[in-house]
């Protein structure tokens, strides 16, 4: 599983449209929020905290927040639009459509019974200069506690 000291895998991710490839910053501090699936109730309850606290995260030195879901880019774009203030926020909703990032980051689990074969575990990772410096992994993928925006923000 993703751990402190892990480096970010070099894989392709997308935002907004298939032609818009996302690259995580190589310098600075940012947060990756891994979620099992767009529009699922627990994920949809977790993400608004990151949108609402975007300025508070910036005040603590966070240059970006990237919500990564094993969904296609059209789904992640629609999901961002579904949140109050989502479209206007600087929070990135990133599609890991084939799960390549999730697998390489060792953050996947088999959700065949409900969401499909591969989904991301629920976590938040603080990344600085390309390395994970803090990680918040939920014990159960349906839980939203350890990786909540409030808990991550209070740790910074």
Curated annotation (Swiss-Prot):
Keywords: Antioxidant, Cytoplasm, Disulfide bond, Nucleus, Oxidoreductase, Peroxidase, Redox-active center. InterPro entries: PRX5-like, Redoxin, Thioredoxin-like_sf, Thioredoxin_domain. One of its GO terms (cellular component) is peroxisome. It is found in: Cytoplasm; Nucleus. Pfam families: Redoxin. The keyword Nucleus applies. Its main location: cytoplasm. It comes from the Eukaryota. Residues 2-156 form the Thioredoxin domain. One of its GO terms (molecular function) is peroxidase activity. One of its GO terms (biological process) is cell redox homeostasis. The active site is at 43 (cysteine sulfenic acid (-soh) intermediate). The active site is a conserved redox-active cysteine residue, the peroxidatic cysteine (C(P)), which makes the nucleophilic attack on the peroxide substrate. The peroxide oxidizes the C(P)-SH to cysteine sulfenic acid (C(P)-SOH), which then reacts with another cysteine residue, the resolving cysteine (C(R)), to form a disulfide bridge. The disulfide is subsequently reduced by an appropriate electron donor to complete the catalytic cycle. In the typical 2-Cys Prx5 family, C(R) is provided by the other dimeric subunit to form an intersubunit disulfide. Pmp20 lacks the resolving cysteine residue. Belongs to the peroxiredoxin family. Prx5 subfamily. Homodimer; disulfide-linked, upon oxidation. May act as a chaperone rather than a peroxidase. Has no thioredoxin-dependent peroxidase activity. Shows weak chaperone activity. This is Peroxisomal membrane associated protein 20. It comes from Schizosaccharomyces pombe (strain 972 / ATCC 24843). The gene is pmp20.
């Amino acid at each position: 599983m993703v751990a402190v000291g892990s480096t970010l895998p070099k894989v392709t991710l997308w935002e907004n449209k298939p032609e818009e490839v996302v690259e995580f910053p190589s310098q600075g501090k940012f947060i990756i929020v891994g979620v099992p699936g767009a529009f699922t109730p627990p994920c949809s309850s977790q993400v608004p905290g990151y949108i609402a606290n975007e300025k508070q995260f910036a005040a603590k030195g966070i240059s970006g927040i990237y919500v990564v879901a094993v969904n296609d880019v059209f789904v992640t774009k629609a999901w961002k639009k579904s949140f109050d203030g989502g479209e206007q926020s600087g929070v990135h909703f990133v599609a890991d459509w084939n799960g390549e990032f999730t697998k390489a980051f060792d953050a996947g689990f088999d959700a065949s019974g409900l969401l499909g074969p591969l989904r991301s575990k629920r976590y938040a990772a603080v990344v600085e200069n390309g390395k994970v410096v803090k990680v918040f992994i939920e014990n159960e993928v349906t839980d939203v506690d350890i990786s909540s925006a409030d808990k991550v923000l209070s740790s910074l």
